[in-house]
Amino acid sequence: MGGGSNNSHNMDNGKYVRYTPEQVEALERLYNDCPKPSSMRRQQLIRECPILSNIEPKQIKVWFQNRRCREKQRKEASRLQAVNRKLTAMNKLLMEENDRLQKQVSHLVYENSYFRQHPQNQGNLATTDTSCESVVTSGQHHLTPQHQPRDASPAGLLSIADETLTEFISKATGTAVEWVQMPGMKPGPDSIGIVAISHGCTGIAARACGLVGLDPTRVAEILKDKPCWLRDCRSLDIVNVLSTANGGTLELIYMQLYAPTTLAPARDFWMLRYTSVMEDGSLVICERSLNNTQNGPSMPPSPHFVRAEILPSGYLIRPCEGGGSILHIVDHFDLEPWSVPEVLRSLYESSTLLAQRTTMAALRYLRQISQEISQPNVTGWGRRPAALRALSQRLSKGFNEAVNGFSDEGWSILESDGIDDVTLLVNSSPTKMMMTSSLPFANGYTSMPSAVLCAKASMLLQNVPPSILLRFLREHRQEWADNSIDAYSAAAIKAGPCSLPIPRPGSFGGQVILPLAHTIENEEFMEVIKLESLGHYQEDMMMPADIFLLQMCSGVDENAVESCAELIFAPIDASFSDDAPIIPSGFRIIPLDSKSEGLSPNRTLDLASALDVGSRTAGDSCGSRGNSKSVMTIAFQLAFEMHMQENVASMARQYVRSVIASVQRVALALSPSSHQLSGLRPPPASPEAHTLARWISHSYRCYLGVDLLKPHGTDLLKSLWHHPDAVMCCSLKALSPVFTFANQAGLDMLETTLVALQDITLDKIFDNNNGKKTLSSEFPQIMQQGFMCMDGGICMSSMGRAVTYEKAVGWKVLNDDEDPHCICFMFLNWSFI
């Protein structure tokens, strides 16, 4: 028993203290309320609980310590058991995959031996084979083998379903398709699974298998609801449902997929889906198109859609010992690539792109749901994961609707101004208008937007990885965005404009990025962008005090397999309610070169993007990308009143064209060897970024005797860009030297962008008598002596704000031939007044 003196004596002799069941029960209750009580709290517990009064406070402390240790051990044991179950399941999966690969090798060896023995039959095989595997797609000619229509009566559909099931299983676990590992996939316990793409089969196909922490029934339920996880799925309508004798289900389905770009039509499918349970308890969901049937239901062609084909595909879901499921996925499509321009055909001929956008998307979504169930924590801004997931789906769907502009959703095309680079659409349907709220003006009048205008365009990019370009657009919004347009868009959901802003390239105050949530593998994340308003708006515009954008970003990981990259954003009200209106705009960049999709560039874009010059160093890893291409799609939406349609259309067209020009300029700066590829040489006065960083650092050390940059490997470029003091270069002209370069701190101090930097002269920032006198007296000293130091003072940003600095240093930057190249200034410990 636990008496006070006996407890102390036993504790001193290292013996255990025995507690009565009542005491243990009381301590457990206290532990649940407070696992780690302080000394005062423990004494209070003894007073409040008489049953513990005969136990020493020190011994109660030991009990709580031991209880926390046991809890930690229990959790660790539980975690290790879960890991062990996962590893056991993965080992089983790998053994099955190894067996399948051995069968595939045996099959290939047999085929190779056969063709070696019968070389004369190869020509006949090539000319007489009329199976689906011999479909030829070349140029604008699409040759489809002629087959007799299949019977679509209930008995005929059951026959098709059984045939589809057999073909799907042979693809998922057999050798019906030659699978090769998808480039760039990293195996391991934390990987998404085993992902493979087809080699040498009809159409495009992808296969994946992995572990999911959900039971098979729940997995099947989620996978059948494609619009919830497949962002490209516009709709999935179940037209008819039939039951089979073995307890299975036949479904006739009409499905529509969005087009990823404005340059190609969308796809639709008329298909059969068969769900059944196999003898070993596995769930199977398989599907295929019903494009050539008779004696049953059919789906006529839809305008603005190209009827594509799903070849036998589906999901094999097996229960896993200890919980969860082992999942096999096969996606096999013929997306009719003949129907799109030649330059875009690889979008519809890339199995890798299919794997990224469809097959892996299913696995990622299931893993995300599993984690949310096991860890239902509240994330940023008080949102639960399901609510944030719904917001991301609304952003994606709204952007896809804008890109596609279907007439059945109320979109109609406006007349062009003679230049077809930007397409304008307007939507005044009641459904669309429910997304906006009333617009109160400064004079007290309240208006309701009666339409939404969309300005969209697509353009081809060359030699710039999508992840690099999109990350730049996200981190340097000031390079392309106009605050007045953002403010106008924000007004549509809170306080409306009475007159239109004038787009001004480079008109941008600043931004603060507030992280919101991210997926398990960080391939997609959401954030809130807080924009600093410039305050240069008309008096009759009731602008929000703060401008917030909800933003979703994906595909910016440079080390991942190059895939589709998206930056989609929409203005939101500060209240950020779940039913807030969302009118998304944004960018989508898709690589067009399947051969280069597996490359993983590792680029530094900071300083390099500041210079309008050509190639990187010879050792740049991106040089191996060659003539890589991608297509960028841009879509911006604005709510407005119908009587302002002409003015809003003109403003939107002008703004999108300015965004396109800015993106092209940035893409050129980020492109490796862009000038060499076009047959041009950079002018001698424009060194590359790495060279300029080396010249600046070397000249500083020569004239001032100390190092400007602390040793940071060999990457002077990155060190200079992230230097805490404002570093900026200007031309050698004695009269009105023009800025040619600034690091990040320098751009922040000048309140400008890389695009507008060259419009700022040195004398503009010293826009006061003392500053100009100092500049006129010190500038010649730099040219003669090589450097100069200035005491603290005040200068001006490009926006007219006063900036104070503790000290300034100027020095002459010499090139490799010891000739002056530019003048560099560094402002130490600067701040806005």
UniProtKB/Swiss-Prot annotation:
PROSITE patterns: HOMEOBOX_2, START. It comes from Arabidopsis thaliana. Pfam families: Homeodomain, MEKHLA, START. Keywords: Coiled coil, Differentiation, DNA-binding, Homeobox, Nucleus, Transcription, Transcription regulation. InterPro entries: HD, HD-Zip_III, Homeodomain-like_sf, MEKHLA, START-like_dom_sf, START_lipid-bd_dom. Residues 150-378 form the START domain. Induction: By auxin. Repressed by miR165. GO terms for cellular component: nucleus. SMART domains: HOX, START. Its main location: nucleus. This is Homeobox-leucine zipper protein ATHB-8. Belongs to the HD-ZIP homeobox family. Class III subfamily. GO terms for molecular function: DNA-binding transcription factor activity; lipid binding; transcription cis-regulatory region binding. Residues 12-75 bind DNA.
